[in-house]
Swiss-Prot record:
One of its GO terms (cellular component) is cytoplasm. The lineage of its organism: Bacteria, Bacillati, Actinomycetota, Actinomycetes, Micrococcales. Belongs to the SepF family. It comes from the Bacteria. GO terms for biological process: division septum assembly; FtsZ-dependent cytokinesis. It comes from Arthrobacter sp. (strain FB24). The gene is sepF. Keywords: Cell cycle, Cell division, Cytoplasm, Septation. The keyword Nuclease does not apply. Homodimer. Interacts with FtsZ. This is Cell division protein SepF. It is found in: Cytoplasm. Residues 19-65 are annotated as: Disordered. Residues 19-45 have a biased composition (Basic and acidic residues). Pfam families: SepF. Its main location: cytoplasm.
Amino acid sequence: MAGALRKTMIYLGLADGDEHYESEHHTPHKDEDDSMEHDREERRAPAPVREIARETPTPHAAEEEYRAPVTPIKRAASSREETTGLRQITTIHPRSYNDAKLIGESFRDGIPVIMNVTDMGEADAKRLVDFSAGLVFGLRGSIERVTNKVFLLSPSYVEVIGDDKKVSETQASFFNQS
């Protein structure tokens, strides 16, 4: 038991090496002593180290080295930054709240979206309008009511020009969140 504790202490560096321990408690036979010293000598003698000559690359070797052809990739202009012309508008007739993903993906890509919620129930239509309001707020766009249940979601670079009609009380109350 003491031997195991002593070996652990030596391993952790809390005690001196094995040579003091062996000389105090154990007297090895002459054959064992010779083999132990022979093992220690083998451990101490490192292998000879050779220096490796480094070759410096010649200018001809660098020219002969294969290089893959490089084709530059031109980045397409982002549709959000494009203000020169409007190419498309998406009209979506959602049937359930699950269609919100399609609305969000189109608007995120910079495409104005006309959302017609006439085919939806009132509760789901309100949820979808709330989602759309958050979407345009997060992407700095705008949302405008076209008719009672039809809305236009436009990105920040699109300006909508139209009549500034006052909406009647019955139309305004449908999506009034106050």
